[in-house]
Amino acid sequence: MLIRYGFDIAVTCQVPTPMVSMLSAHGERAHHIREAEQWVTTPPVATRTYVDLYGNHCRRFVAPQGDIALWGDGTIEDGGASDPVLHGAREVPVPDLPDGCLIYLLGSRYCETDRLSQIAWDLFGHIPPGWGRVQAICDFVHGHIRFGYLDARATRTAAEAYEERMGVCRDYAHLAVAFCRCLNIPARYVNGYLGDIGVPIVDPMD
């Protein structure tokens, strides 16, 4: 199926402000693009692009003082299939992991493996390695955190989400990723567009 994606964002800056946007399709999906992405700013400003460490297509520019609008539009082809379920997936011992995976075992600003390591091993260390253990992590996080937009906080970390038992989408992801890393399972998550395909319209989207 063809999916039209895009954005229309307005920002107000008190002073000229350097910015980096990551709103383009990931490079791995380049061969699925069917209508090239358009990227427009109002007022027009000079931009340049680069690819970061993770393969994201980033765009740098300086937003002027006052209002600026960012607008983009593109079409991508996607099969619409759900993520595969691989019950036989196994964990790879740390010595055998590819070099490029090791970075996804490290703690980070939002995933404090040092604070959560003992908790992770207490909760999941008895579960046999493999798909089942990762699924147990996801199931635990799903039941442990209460979702609520009013509970959103940009500074909340995985450990705080665990302690407060509340959060939004990113908090679920941060806690699950942190638990996986604590158990030596390389993990990362991808942030994407909020899709409205086949979703009942209840409230205005984010």
Show where each model-derived region lies.
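Glycine-centered loop/turn motifs
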Residues: 66, 73, 127, 200-202
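Short, surface-exposed, charge-dense and proline/glycine-enriched linear segments
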Residues: 50-55, 82-85, 117, 163-168, ...
